[in-house]
Each structure stands twice: as C-alpha cells, then as structure tokens.
Amino acid sequence: MPNKNDNKGKYSRLEKEAKKAREEKISIPNVLPAIAMRSNMVIFPNTVVPFYVGREISLMALEEAMEKTNQIVFVVNQKDPAVETPTEKDLYKVGTIVRIIQVGKLPDETFKVLVEGIARAKWIKNVGEKFFKFEIEILRTRYGKSKRLIALMRMVKEELHKYVQYSRKIPPETLMLLEDVDNPDVFADIAASLCPGNIEEKQQLLEIVHPANRLERILDILARETELLEIEQQLDQKVKERIEKSQREYYLREKLRVIRDELGGEEDIEIKELKEKIENNNYPEFVKEKARAEINRLEKMSPYAPEATVVRTYLDWILNLPWHEKTDDTDDINFAEKVLNEDHYGLDEPKRRILEYLATRKVSQKAKAPIICFVGPPGVGKTSLAKSIARAMNRKFGRMSLGGLRDEAEIRGHRRTYVGAMPGRIMQLIRKLGVKNPVILLDEIDKMGISFQGDPASALLEVLDPEQNKEFVDHYIELPYDLSEVLFVTTANVLYTIPPALRDRMEVIEISSYTDVEKFYIAKNYIIPKIESEFVEKADEIFSFKDTAIKKIINEYTLEPGVRELEREIRSVVRKATLDAIKTGKKIVISPEKVTEYLGPSKIKDEDKLEKPMIGVTTGLAWTPNGGTTLYIESTLIPGNGGLIITGQLGDVMKESVRIALSLARKIVGDEYAEKFTKNDIHVHVPEGAVPKDGPSAGVTITTALVSVVKNIPVRNDIAMTGEITLRGRVLPVGGIKEKVMAAYRKGIYHVILPKKNEVDIEKVPEVVRTKMKFTFVETIEEVLEVALNEDNSKESRKGRTRKGNSNTK
C-alpha cells in the first residue's frame, strides 16, 4: 500500500483535475470508491461542505475518484469514530454520493476536500481490495408537491427561525439558503444540514428518503432543541438576576455600614436589644461572657452572611434557657399522696418512694433527685404514673421517647460546625418547659440501639449520674448546665437489654402485672368513671355495670398484664349498650349475659383444672409477660431402651431442667425401679406446643411427674408448684411469685408449693388472695414429693413448712 510520501506527486495535481471535472456533465457510475467518515458530520445531498482526508485508505479512494470516476466519490459515516481501520460492519449502510469541487493540501500532509452532495445511496457490497469500493444503489422516491409538503416546509422554516434566535451555532444569514428553494427534497436536505442533533439523529435523517417524513422528523428535533435552549436561557436569566441582586445588596449594605461609621457607629437595633437583654437578666456570669463574645463576632459580620444566622440562633438558645427559673415543689405530703392515689390504684412502692423524696426535700434542700426506673410489662401504668408524679410534686412534665434511638447527638446535640445543628432533645425539653426542675420521662430506655452514629446509652450515663449532671455540657450549647434538679423517670419492659453501667445509675422499681382483683378495682373505680365522664348526658341514665359483668370481661376477654385491653373491651361494651339504650329508650344494665351478647364467645381459652389426681401429670406455675399461668407437665413410659423424648417447643434451659429431673428421679426411686428406666423410653410433654417455653422454674414439677410415672403414684390435682432443682435435690428460688400465685388462685388451686427462699415474696400477693391460699415452703425435692405424691390426699405433709397465707403468720 502506498504511503503519504510516495503520493506527494500524485496529489499535487488533484486540485487541477477537480476544476476540470466541474465543467463536465455529471455521470454516476454503479461502482464508486468510498471514503469512511469518522467526524461528527453527515453530508446531505444538495449541500456543499468541506471535510478532511488523512488516512491512506481514504487518500487512495480520493485518488481513484479524481482519476477514474469523474470526481465522484461515495461518502459514508463510521458507526464508531474511534476505529482506525474500519471494515464493512463498522459502516452505516446509507451514505451520500458527492462531487469533488476542490482539493487543498494542508501542512500536516492531510487534504481539505470541498464536495457537493448529489444523491443519497446505499452500498450493496465492497469490491475493493486496498480501499473501500462499493457497488451502490441510488435511493429515490416519487412524490408530488402537496399542500401537506408546503405546510411542513413553512413550519420547518418558522421553527428554524425560532432556533436561530436562541442558538449562536447558526448565523441568521444562513437561513437565506432556504428562501428561494421550492423543491421539497432539496429543502428537506438543506434543513437537515442546518438541524442540530447528534450523529445518530443526522444519520436517521439521511436514511429517510421521502421528503415529507424527513421534514416531520426535522420538525420534532427542532422543537425539542428550541425548548431546551429556551429553558437554558430562562435559567441563565434567573442566575444573572440573582447575581445582580446580590451585588446590589452587598453594595447597599457596605454603603450603609460606612454611613453608620461616619455618624458615630450607631448600633444595629437587634444587637442593641441583645446587649440590653444580657444586662437586664440574671444570667450566670459564664453565660454573659459567652453571649458578649458571640455578639462581638456578630457585629463584625454582614447581617446577611450565613454565619450571622448561625450566631443569632445560638444566642437565641443560650439566652432563652431557664438558667434559674424553677417551680416550687409541694410541701404538702398528704396532697401529693392524694393525687397519686387518685390517678392509680396499687403501685405502692413507687408512690412510697416519691413521698419519701418529697419528705426529704422538705427538711433538706440539698437532697438529690432520685433516678427512678419503672420496669414492668406493657400497660401497667408506667408512663401515666410519671405524669402523676409531676402533678403530685407540682412540677412541669416532659416526655422523651428513646425507643429505636441510635444517634448519640439526640442526647448530646450536634456541634455548631454542622449545617442545621441543634441542641440535644434533653436541652430542647428544658427550654420548652421553661424550668430547670421538671419531671422528664425517658420512655422505653431498654429499646435504644447502637450504630455508627454513636451509642446513646453511653451518652445517657452523664445525664443520669447525680454526680456528673450538675455540669452537663451539650455539644451545641457548649456551656455547663445543671440537670441535678431534674427528676428523671425512666421506663423499661425488661432490664437485661439495659447496659450494666446505665442500670447501676438508676433505682429500679418493678411494677408487676395487675391481679384480677386489682383489675376489677381499676375497672370499677377508674376506667368506667372515666368513660362516664366523657358523656354529655348523665351516663348512669344510659348504662350501668354489674360486678359480675366486669369480672367476666377480665377473666374471659382479656389476658394481659396491664389494663389497656380491658379498657378497650369495656369501651366496646359501652358503645353497644349506648346504641341499645338510644334505640329502646331504656337504661341498659350490663350483665354477664349482655357481655357475651356484645363481645361474642369468650376469647380466653384456658385449660381447666385437673378433675382428679393423675399419674405422671403435674400442675406447674409459669411467668409470662402477660402475667402468671398454669403449666401442665405430662410424662409417660413407652417400651424402648432408656431414651428421653422431649416435646412442647421447650427452650434450651427447660430441656436441661428435664435432663436434671430425669437424673434426680432415677436417684430418688433407687435400684428397685431401675429396669423401668432401661427398658422404657420416657416421654415428657408440655401442652400448647405452639407456644415457646423456657426457664428453670419447672424443675420440681418435672421431677414430680417423672417420679409419679415410675412409681405409678397419682399426683394431687389440688396442688400447684414451682421451683428450680439441682442434682443434689435442692430447691432453688425463682421469680414471678406474685403472678404465679395469682394464676393458681384463678384456676381454683389454693395450695401452692414454693421454694423456702421465696417465702418473703408472699407479702407481695394481695391480702385478699393471700388469706385464702395455703403455702408449703420446701428446701428439697423429697419435701415436695411428700406433699404432692401423698396417697392420702387429705393428709397434711409432715415435712416442709406449711402455713395459711395470713400476712401476720410467721
């Protein structure tokens, strides 16, 4: 293949030959040399454009056209301009037949070629070897000059005029090319060459043969580009106006500042007011110093500077915090006790603790406020008790929910360097309440999380520590603030999710689930009167409750530790009773039968008490978040080889209790019953298999069931038991005694076996229940078996300590 240096002589005469070819009649051969274009330009018929030729294959095609095809060459675009040595697959199928008008050589050995587009054509196949040489087919179409074509030409011309108004790419005089053109095909090609768009869109226009279709596509492209240019111009205008406005404001502000300086430095009204506020109020000295420093910064800034807004916001915060303002605590202990009892029934321990604090404050103003944590199941009144405490103490009340909190800045605030920085929620509450000694409830403290944004539980360590919160520093405020007079009350459902360091700073008061007796009293004296007070007319003329109806709702329609569901069910009954009263015009007395009518069948499907003593079946007691419940343990022997089968969806701890109970049972029964363990499999099952169960407190119950099934002795059905066991047969204390005793009482079981060390917990059981119960306190499993497996069910145990539940019995 020849190179550029070899062809210097040949191309020196190209310009002369081009001039000669223009004077001759155009004749288009069927086979033409082809130049592959890799610029972003598409040559259309009926247009005159220049382009550059530099590659060897293009120079050879140009030479071929000048010498053999009467200066006619086929120009086709590459699909990818980056391809240096293209093949047929790199080219579009449709190109333009052009006539060479002029060829000029450039200093860099490339040639500038001026051509005139003659016709659009598509190549059939390549017959060249060293360069592209295509068999071509000219693309023609027949059309008449219809009104539609004339309208399209007019619309394209108008749209081009619009485009030229917004774009600087096309000189206005260029549109003169279209003024005298009445041939639609020529008009469409010239318009296409002026039309904006990328290489793909231009190639599509070239491939559209019919002028009407070509004009429609040109119209679409022009309309789109004109709209975009119009939007760009509008945006540019807005930006320009803003810049001019900003410059004008800056000029006027500077001018005003100079005038003020000349007149003797007259202070800004806002700054003057801030200075007066600092001097006229009793702020701590360190607050005044900080405020003065910030005001000095503000004076040196432009009033409209972004930093000035940050300083103003900061000054607003530190000057509006209650540095000294506080409410006076009530010194009437009887009044405080009355308020607490009005709002809540029971809850003696938290009430007593608040009254103790008030009594201490009455004689010593230096008494530190306790950090109280109420722990208990949902709905038992933890949050509402905190509100009552504030009312009883004559303090303002604020609540902050910690559930799901993961960002430390929610407690400590953001540093002022951050955009949109704000103080933490503790300081926000203090400012909102306007006093430095409110009651603040930190709700759901057990449900905080940890994330990459920090650990909010660790941030609370300073807040809830009486030794540190005297000088609590919020990241935004940056000044020490005394939180020691704030009474913090926290609530939680469980303790184990609270970090030990945080738990150690709080005085934990457990609020257990309400008993049925307490629920009845609350429903009768709190819930129903509250509902009645919401009626416009006298509620006692519309409905009334029988005590038996309230008890039916408690026992058969609610199973919860608190009273939220109980209130919902009572409200449902009241709504239906009110509707009946309005329809009939008579007062509705709500009886148990009416409860069934209004609420439907019983929602609580509780298993009945065992009808008679049974072999291998014992009644245990369990604690759940909804209160206490009875738990039946079943065991049986089946032929086998000493295996153990455990069913009932038991957790790992309870499974371990079963294995301990089995080992202990084998030890208790001795060699006399050894064959029963080796020739049988033992199956232990806890009914209600869909409910997960876990914990060690069923140890004595399982052991009793196993000994019963091996010895073939029935277990008394009038006794319930709870307690953890060891391999030595010791009975260890367990939790939830109050709830478990109440569960036995509800079931009609009035004799309960408990660990000896749980005897002190009996005092927590309501006296009305305690006096009706009999408790046997045991230290070993043998004492349990003496009572539970006594063949004479009426015979009292000779071992273990048994007493009636009178609170005075010791």
UniProtKB/Swiss-Prot annotation:
- Domain Lon N-terminal positions: 32-226
E.C. no: 3.4.21.53
Keywords for this entry?
A: ATP-binding, Cytoplasm, Hydrolase, Nucleotide-binding, Protease, Serine protease, Stress response
Keyword Nucleotide-binding found: yes
Q: Which intervals hold domain Lon proteolytic?
A: 612-791
Respond yes or no to whether keyword Hydrolase is given for this record. Answer: yes
Any GO MF annotation of the entry:
ATP hydrolysis activity
Q: Where does ATP bind?
A: 376-383
Q: Which PROSITE patterns match?
A: LON_N, LON_PROTEOLYTIC, LON_SER
Q: Which InterPro entries match?
A: AAA+_ATPase, ATPase_AAA_core, Lon_bac, Lon_bac/euk-typ, Lon_lid, Lon_proteolytic, Lon_Prtase, Lon_prtase_N
Q: Which GO terms describe its biological process?
A: cellular response to heat; protein quality control for misfolded or incompletely synthesized proteins
Q: Which cysteines are joined by disulfide bonds?
A: none
Q: Which GO terms describe its cellular component?
A: cytoplasm
Pfam families per record = AAA, Lon_C, Lon_lid, LON_substr_bdg
Compartments reported by the entry: Cytoplasm
Q: Which enzyme class? A: hydrolase
Q: What induces it?
A: By heat shock.
The organism sits in which domain of life? Bacteria
| Reaction equations catalysed | Hydrolysis of proteins in presence of ATP
The active site lies at: 697, 740
Q: What does this protein do?
A: ATP-dependent serine protease that mediates the selective degradation of mutant and abnormal proteins as well as certain short-lived regulatory proteins. Required for cellular homeostasis and for survival from DNA damage and developmental changes induced by stress. Degrades polypeptides processively to yield small peptide fragments that are 5 to 10 amino acids long. Binds to DNA in a double-stranded, site-specific manner.
UniProt lists the family membership as follows: Belongs to the peptidase S16 family.
Q: How does it assemble?
A: Homohexamer. Organized in a ring with a central cavity.
Report the protein name in the record. Answer: Lon protease
**Gene coding for it:** lon
